[in-house]
Each structure stands twice: as C-alpha cells, then as structure tokens.
Amino acid sequence: METLFSGIQPSGIPTIGNYIGALKQFVDVQNDYDCYFCIVDQHAITMPQDRLKLRKQTRQLAAIYLASGIDPDKATLFIQSEVPAHVQAGWMLTTIASVGELERMTQYKDKAQKAVEGIPAGLLTYPPLMAADIVLYNTNIVPVGDDQKQHIELTRNLVDRFNSRYNDVLVKPEIRMPKVGGRVMSLQDPTRKMSKSDDNAKNFISLLDEPNVAAKKIKSAVTDSDGIIKFDRDNKPGITNLISIYAGLTDMPIKDIEAKYEGEGYGKFKGDLAEIVKAFLVEFQEKYESFYNSDKLDDILDQGRDKAHKASFKTVKKMEKAMGLGRKR
C-alpha cells in the first residue's frame, strides 16, 4: 500500500473550502493509502504565535480531522512537535539546500514582505522542514493545492540531491492536485481562494461558524446579474463557486445541479444552499464537540504520535548513517 502524507497548520479554524478541497477527500482515500495526517505546529511558529491560542487551535484541528471522518484505525493523526524526527530530518535537509533556492520560494517572498520586525530565519528554512515531514514516512503521494506545489517540487529536488550525494535512502514523492471543483473561492471575491486568515469574515465560512451566520453569508455571496445557474469559472465565478460548495456538500454532480435549478433564480438556489450549509455545520459541530472535550482525542493523538515516531525514527537513522552522523554501532 502506498503512503500519503498531508500537513495542516493550526493557525486558524479550517473553512468549508478546506473541508471540500482537502478534509473530505482525505476521508475518501484513507481506505486506499497508508495515510499520515500531521498537525504542523512547528511550521506555525515561523510567524509569531500566542502559545495558549496555538495549543487550543492544535486541539481544535485534531477534533476537526476526526469530525470530518478520519478514522484513527485506518489513518495516523499526530502533532508534528511531538515527533522529534521532524526537526532532526529538517536540519539534515537544510544542510543540502541552498539559500538561493529557498529565497526563490513564493511564500517566503510574500511573508517576508509582511514581516514587521525583521524576517524570521524560520521562514527561509520552512521548506526543508516541510520536505522532512514528507520523506520521513516514505511518502509516495502528497495532495496539495497550487500554493504548495513549488514546495513539493523543492522536496523532490532535495530527495534527488540527498540520494545522489549519499545513498538512495529517501523516497521521491509525487504531487496530487485537488480534483476539479474541489477549489472553493471567497464568497465576496470569487477570483480569490477562500482563506481562513481573511480579514473579512464575510469572505469565508469557518467549520465552527454559527450555522445561522453561515447561512446568511451564503445568501449575501457575490453572483452576477443574469440569474442563470451554470458552472462557468471564467465568466460566472460567483455562482460557479456556490455550485462547487453545493456539489461538495451533497456529492451531487454539477450537471445535475444545473438541471435541477434550470429556470430558477439565484434567490431559490442560494436559499437551498444556505439550508444545506446550515444542516452540514450543525451535524459537523456536534461531532466536533464530542471529540474536542473528550479523553478519547488524547488517546488518538498518543496512538498517532507513537506510530509516527516508530516510522520516522527508522528514516532518521538511515539518513544519519548515510551522512556519517553519530557513532557507528
């Protein structure tokens, strides 16, 4: 069975877009791959974080994974900082990366421009740590969006460099892009991806939004003026985005949605979608609360940590041996 790895930062509550584009798809593939789902809190601290808020959001994200349908008997859910091999392997890969290629990373450039008090070194060395996250588990498949594709390409380059310089120790991962329709956009500006860090709360629906508030956001979402329910990302981005949300939450094919609402106006469609979103959030949040406030969540994270540690320790030891680190025993 091939291995799939995915990491999400606990830097905010995931949106309904994160659910449709990632979490829901993870549930679908956990029967087909040996899945490792990592809460990458060490990546989060490359930017300033409040320690209490970070811990809370880490636990919230773990509960959200489980509420989404991740089965701890099929997949490994764990927290990055609880598995020491990540920073160990991250440092080893940092030593074979060049400053030039790290400075070319688009996310580094974007975040460095926003840095108020100097550029944290962790921003620059973020990609080798991300590469370590992936290679530690002999990962074959990494599901990512366009914004992370450049980092995975760098990971593949670092794997080639390590294997060429030392030994064929590391597995070279393949990129898997989200399926068509899996990308959910901003509700008020459907030319931009929906983001949990957006300053305008009307642009996104958090998985922990109050359901009635979320329904209002759907009803006030931007559309066009012709009133035709048709999937056309180039010419009708607003209604196309709402159709994507409808399809993502109901599993109804886009063509069937178009046929169902043929001759109907946007008011009817938005009203129905608002109720679908509301019902989804009510059920989702009930599951979330049952995990967040339970000892079972800690048991699952302990189990995931132990499995991840066992698997990653083997890879780190192979890397250390290949590089000549430590004593020969």
UniProtKB/Swiss-Prot annotation:
Organism, scientific name: Staphylococcus aureus (strain MRSA252)
Function: Catalyzes the attachment of tryptophan to tRNA(Trp).
Superkingdom of the source species: Bacteria
Pfam families tied to this protein: tRNA-synt_1b
Enzyme class, first EC level, given as a word: ligase
Keyword terms: Aminoacyl-tRNA synthetase, ATP-binding, Cytoplasm, Ligase, Nucleotide-binding, Protein biosynthesis
Motif ('HIGH' region): 10-18
Listed NCBIfam families: trpS
Subunit structure: Homodimer.
InterPro entries (alphabetical): aa-tRNA-synth_I_CS, aa-tRNA-synth_Ic, Rossmann-like_a/b/a_fold, Trp-tRNA-ligase, Trp-tRNA-ligase_bac-type, Trp-tRNA_synthetase
Motif mapping: 'KMSKS' region: 193-197
EC number per UniProt: 6.1.1.2
One BP annotation, GO: tryptophanyl-tRNA aminoacylation
Protein localization: Cytoplasm
Gene: trpS
Protein name from the UniProt record: Tryptophan--tRNA ligase
GO molecular function: ATP binding; tryptophan-tRNA ligase activity
